[in-house]
Amino acid sequence: MKQVTGGVCAAQGFSAAGIHCGIRKNQAKRDLALIYSAVPASAAAVYTTNLVKGAPLTVTKAHLADGKAQAIVCNSGNANTCNADGIAVAEEMSALTAAALHIAPQDVIVASTGVIGQPLDLAPIRTGLPQLAAALGDHSDQAAEGIMTTDTQPKEIAVQFTAGGKTCTIGGIAKGSGMIHPNLATMLVFLTTDCAISAPMLHAALTGDVQDTFNMVSVDGDTSTNDMVAVPVSYTHLRAHE
């Protein structure tokens, strides 16, 4: 296994971007991130076991019931948690993302991170998503910045390895510096890969692997309401050879 550059864009078929849309007051801070697969992808996710869960997790779990996704959208600055309209807001965020990308809303993984208990204003997201979609490219670093809250620096990595004679790539971005404690998923983590793997096997691999990785991380003993590790698989390179 070797480390490569590119973050979530290192795996074939993925693009990403991050912008400041206005959720956060500091205009120098990106607050909206997008990861996109050029084709529908197998996908899996694991979630916090906190009894209080953010609305985005509820919506994402429903969307991933079929084991498929094509995009991940995440805002920072507001967790969309403990809000009466949280589910509706998360669903609308998915719909806005889907419209900007011309995909189905149920193929969008939605996540939010930030202050708990404050309503999430969709106006800046509604305005920013078309711009964000248009900016998609090899911008994993932007997406990594877009999901940060109290983090002191962005977190991204990508590795390559050989399996069955084929080169596979896994990329990832993450956020989290507080409210980190085992009981999955410890923090927000978005992974991408171009490995040929089915949705059931992907879920089994992810669920098993986090036990010896993310579930061993503790900073302050607080399990967050919005923790998630999500991974879509792009088959762009496979379709190119069909």
Residue ranges of model-derived segments:
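N-terminal amphipathic/basic leader segments beginning at the initiator methionine
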Residues: M1-Y47
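Conserved small/polar residues in nucleotide/adenosyl-binding loops
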Residues: T236-E242
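Short, well-ordered amphipathic alpha-helical segments that serve as non-catalytic structural scaffolds
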Residues: V52-H63, A88-A100, H203-M216
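Glycine-rich, mobile lid/loop segments that gate access to catalytic sites or pores
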Residues: A100, P105-F214
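Active-site-flanking structural segment that lines cofactor/substrate pockets
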Residues: I35-G67
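Channel- or pocket-lining gating/hinge segments that regulate access to a cavity or pore
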Residues: T193, V233-Y235
